[in-house]
C-alpha cells in the first residue's frame, strides 16, 4: 500500500502522517509498515538540535497509525474507509534504542482482540532488525467527523 492509499484510510496529513508505506498486510492478523526518518522532520528542530532523536511519543503515534490501518483492513465493513481510529489506551510501553535521521522505522501491529468498537494490538518498532520500542495499543473506531 503506497502513501496515496494510506491517505484514504488515515485522516492524518503532513507533518503528522507517520506511515510512508505498508509492506505486508494480513487482515485480522498483522500489518508491517515503514516510516523513513529524515533530518527534515519538523520535530528535529527542537528535539534535539545538536543530537536529533525522534520523540518516543511520535514512535508510539506511528505505531498507533499502523493499528488504524490494520483495523481498517480487517473490518472494512464495520465503518468503511471513512472511519477514524482514536488512540484510547497504552500498556506495556518500552523503549530501547533511539531513532535518528536516516533510520527506516519498521512498524508492526499484530491484532489481539476487539470488543464492540475497541481494538487491541501488540505493536513493535525496529530499525535494521534492532528493537526500538513496543506497546500494547488500544484504539476506538468512530465514523469520520464524530
Swiss-Prot record:
It is an enzyme of class 4 (lyase). It comes from the Bacteria. It catalyses: a (3R)-hydroxyacyl-[ACP] = a (2E)-enoyl-[ACP] + H2O. Its EC number is 4.2.1.59. GO terms for biological process: fatty acid biosynthetic process; lipid A biosynthetic process. One of its GO terms (molecular function) is (3R)-hydroxyacyl-[acyl-carrier-protein] dehydratase activity. GO terms for cellular component: cytoplasm; membrane. Keywords: Cytoplasm, Lipid A biosynthesis, Lipid biosynthesis, Lipid metabolism, Lyase. It is found in: Cytoplasm. InterPro entries: FabA_FabZ, FabZ, HotDog_dom_sf. It holds the Pfam family FabA. Disulfide bonds: none annotated. The active site is at 47. NCBIfam families: fabZ (TIGR01750), PRK00006.1 (NF000582). Involved in unsaturated fatty acids biosynthesis. Catalyzes the dehydration of short chain beta-hydroxyacyl-ACPs and long chain saturated and unsaturated beta-hydroxyacyl-ACPs. Belongs to the thioester dehydratase family. FabZ subfamily. This is 3-hydroxyacyl-[acyl-carrier-protein] dehydratase FabZ.
Amino acid at each position: 500500500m503506497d502513501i496515496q492509499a494510506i491517505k484514504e484510510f488515515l485522516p492524518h496529513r503532513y507533518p503528522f502522517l507517520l506511515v510512508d508505506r505498508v509492506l505486508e498486510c494480513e487482515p485480522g492478523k498483522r500489518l508491517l509498515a515503514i516510516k523513513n526518518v529524515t533530518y527534515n522532520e519538523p520535530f528535529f528542530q527542537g528535539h534535539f538540535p545538536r543530537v536529533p532523536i525522534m520523540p518516543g511519543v511520535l514512535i508510539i503515534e506511528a505505531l498507533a497509525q499502523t493499528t488504524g490501518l490494520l483495523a481498517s483492513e480487517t473490518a472494512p465493513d464495520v465503518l468503511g474507509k471513512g472511519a477514524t481510529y482514536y488512540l484510547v489506551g497504552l500498556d506495556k510501553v518500552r523503549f530501547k534504542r533511539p531513532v535518528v535521521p536516516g533510520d527506516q522505522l519498521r512498524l508492526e501491529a499484530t491484532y489481539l482482540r476487539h470488543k464492540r468498537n475497541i481494538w487491541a494490538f501488540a505493536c513493535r518498532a525496529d530499525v535494521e532488525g534492532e528493537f526500538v520500542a513496543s506497546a500494547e495499543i488500544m484504539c476506538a473506531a468512530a465514523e469520520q467527523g464524530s
